[in-house]
UniProtKB/Swiss-Prot annotation:
Gene3D superfamilies: GHMP Kinase, N-terminal domain, K Homology domain, type 1, Nucleic acid-binding proteins. It catalyses: RNA(n+1) + phosphate = RNA(n) + a ribonucleoside 5'-diphosphate. Its cofactor is Mg(2+). This is Polyribonucleotide nucleotidyltransferase. GO terms for biological process: mRNA catabolic process; RNA processing. SMART domains: KH (SM00322), S1 (SM00316).
């Protein structure tokens, strides 16, 4: 059965009961040429964990873009960062919908089967998963809807195409149910205005306006899904739910005899994310005569202690306007900043805020150091020239846990910090940048400490960022008709609060925002109040960062030296040499990296030794000069160049064979041993060496043949 839903600038086609019929819920969703399969599977036996056993996996199939996976093993293996981050977005959007006490292991799988380059896979992926979950026998009050908002030509645009997003100043992703927002992710998108770069920060009022715009689209989408699929939803399964552990006798006993102990534990927990102090109280209660006589269960006592702790913390904040560590609601923990503490690192910053500490280190590299990855919606590999990586070892919270490869949380926090800092990094920066945040202590807000430390680490490495960027984690607590907004939350407040959101930006506005809402609806006025309080906190931190910035001593001696100059693009072949021999010899001889831009003739040389860089430049200029002298002094040289292309005419068509694929295009073998260049901008599909293409001569200039694809 096919169902069409026309909403939020998309015509969405859903096919129900066609595929994956043994899953608890499934749907095939199509938007233009994008096709996504979403399935939900549920076990029939509960588990004992005290958390929701939900797993979300978003997987992109390479055949969706007509490709065969690269590498030695020709199949999809470990998910890429984009897949992992998208899985996390779907998880954060759907997790709040599950009923309280639900403890059945549940898996949501999203397969991208066909990818249209213009369609937003994250929006389609979430909405397909939402409909599949709503159709299942798991009780859901309404389907989630996810939307993306752009800001193009001074207007908000709902669900822009990928091409439109390239011209947007805003990338806002919001998910919710009806009029309740559940998850928000935002970043500003920098662009060039002539020779000047705009960071495109968003003011607090403009941000509220954008979220309001998104919320109306979510209401329309969620309502449309409910109206379309409510009659198709499976009957709710007869599930058992873990009851809320309530025992009035135990609760009264704890309140009468252990209030001071719990309060002392809260004071201690304000300094750490670990709950060891509460465990001690539980053990103490279990050893009491009352507990032994009444045969109290340890897990029940532990649960009630946790609730009592939560009650005390929230009561202090709401009624006494006082936090567990004695701070005012808008007070930031003490901050200390040290820069360039690592003598052989290009740039470093040790940023400490209370019991959260991040050592952030920046390294500068050449073009070959960029992270290259494939995307289903791009015909050419994506080169990531600014990387931000976040590490969270167990010792930062006092745990003896094994060091593993980064998980979803680490990737998510690193991505947030990267989004916050990217607008400040010059788009024309000549070097590849890798910034790493090592969390050495954690008691809340480690991702925002990474942003602050990262901004100063970039400056310490000599990167001329446009502005300093600071971040602060905020919290929100609701009790009846009262609310409290907290600045710079610690782990305790994050755990027992109703909402946490992280805001990063400059004095002029917000560059990145992430919000997870546990309580459902939040008014725009409270949201505006929270963002303005975050702005005050951000400006306070920026004051301290500016002082630290003035004290930075850049270690020029260890920074890589770079020379950028131009040559005649036609001389690139002489610099490279036959089979790359000449350029390889220069790289080995002078221990430098050399990057050539064949279209513009730009040459970029980078190395640790200034003299070596200058000598490499001198050698390249000599190669170019000798080539020029040879052309001037040799009639044969000129005649030979004309002869090579004399048999070709502009507009002439050939069946050419792909001979070599480069980052700037593909060399196509034509006839008589002559090659032509098909520039990357003309390539519409993934190419492989040996492919046959119908091409046309577009231009013949200085003995070089430029090609285009035949229609």
């Amino acid at each position: 059965m096919k169902y069409a839903v026309e909403v939020n600038n998309n015509v969405e086609i859903f096919e129900i009961n066609k595929v994956a019929k043994q899953a608890a819920g499934a749907c095939l969703m199509k938007v233009k040429n994008t096709v996504v399969l979403a399935t939900v599977a549920r076990e029939n036996t509960q588990v004992e964990e005290d958390f929701l056993p939900l797993t979300v996996q978003y997987i992109e199939k390479q055949y969706a873009a007509g490709r065969i996976p690269g590498g030695y093993i020709k199949r999809e293996t470990k998910p890429g960062d984009f897949e992992t981050l998208t899985s996390r977005i779907i998880d954060r959007s759907l997790r709040p919908l599950f009923p309280k006490g639900y403890a059945y292991p549940t898996q949501i799988v999203v397969f991208v089967l066909s990818a249209d380059p213009e369609i937003d896979l994250q929006v389609v992926g979430l909405n397909a998963a939402s409909v599949a979950l709503y159709l299942s026998d798991i009780p859901m009050k309404a389907p989630v809807c996810g939307v993306r908002v752009g800001y193009i030509n001074d207007s908000f645009v709902i669900n822009p195409t990928n091409s439109e997003l390239q011209n947007s100043a805003l990338d806002l992703y919001v998910a919710g149910v009806k009029d309740e927002m559940l998850m928000i992710e935002m970043r500003s998108l920098p662009n060039m205005n002539g020779e000047n770069q705009n960071m495109n920060e968003f003011s607090e009022d403009k941000m509220v306006e954008a979220i309001d715009f998104a919320s109306k689209a979510i209401l329309a989408g969620s309502t449309a899904y409910e109206n379309t699929f409510s009659a198709l939803k499976k009957p709710d399964a007869a599930l058992e739910y873990k009851p809320e552990v309530e025992d009035e006798n135990i609760a009264n006993f704890i309140e009468q005899n252990f209030t001071s102990d719990v309060q002392a534990a809260i004071n201690q927990m304000a300094k750490s994310e670990r709950a060891t102090e509460l465990d001690k109280i539980v053990n103490k209660i279990m050893q009491s005569e009352t507990a032994i006589q009444n045969e109290w269960q340890k897990n029940v006592v532990s649960n009630i202690i946790g609730k009592f702790k939560r009650k005390i913390i929230r009561s202090q904040i709401i009624n006494e306007r006082r936090r567990a560590d004695g701070r005012a609601l808008d007070e930031i923990r003490p901050i200390s900043i040290e820069t360039n503490i690592l003598p052989n690192a290009h740039g470093s910053c040790l940023f400490t805020r209370g019991q959260t500490q991040a050592l952030v280190v920046t390294t500068l590299g050449g073009e070959t150091d960029a992270q290259v990855s494939d995307s289903l919606t791009s015909n050419t590999p994506i080169s990531e020239r600014f990387m931000f990586q976040y590490n969270f070892p167990g010792f930062c919270v006092g745990e003896a846990s094994p060091l593993k490869s980064p998980g979803r949380r680490e990737l998510g926090h690193g991505n947030l910090a990267k989004r916050a800092l990217t607008p400040s990094v010059p788009l024309n920066n000549p070097q590849v940048i890798r910034t790493v945040s090592e969390i050495l202590e954690s008691n809340g807000s480690s991702s925002m400490a990474s942003v602050c430390g990262g901004s100063l680490s970039l400056r310490a490495a000599g990167v001329s960022t446009l502005k300093l960027v600071a971040g602060v984690a905020m919290g929100l607590i609701f009790e009846d008709d009262k609310h409290a907004i907290l600045t710079d939350i610690m782990g305790l407040e994050d755990h027992d609060g109703d909402m946490d959101f992280k805001v990063a930006g400059t004095r002029e506005g917000i560059t990145a925002l992430q919000m997870d809402i546990k309580l459902g609806g939040i008014s725009l006025e409270i949201l505006r109040e929270a963002l303005n309080q975050a702005k005050d906190g951000r400006n306070y931190i920026l004051n301290l960062m500016e002082v630290a910035n003035d004290d930075i001593i850049i270690n020029e001696e260890i920074l890589p030296k770079i020379e950028i100059f131009g040559v005649d693009p036609n001389k690139m072949v002489d610099i490279i040499g036959q089979g790359g021999k000449t350029i390889k010899e220069l790289i080995d001889k002078y221990e430098v990296s050399i990057d050539l831009e064949r279209d513009s003739g730009e040459v970029k040389i980078q190395g640790a030794n200034k003299i070596n860089v200058e000598n490499a430049k001198s050698d390249i200029l000599n190669i170019v000069k000798k080539s020029n002298d040879f052309k001037k002094g040799s009639k044969f040289g000129h005649h030979h160049e004309r002869k090579e292309t004399s048999n070709f005419q502009v507009g002439e068509e050939f069946d050419g064979v792909v001979k070599k694929i480069m980052d700037f295009g593909a060399f196509i073998s034509l006839k008589d041993g002559i090659d032509g260049l098909l520039h990357v901008s003309k390539i519409k599909t993934q190419l492989s060496e040996g492919d046959t293409l119908r091409v046309k001569v577009e231009e013949i200039k200085r003995g070089k043949i430029s090609l285009e694809l035949c229609e």
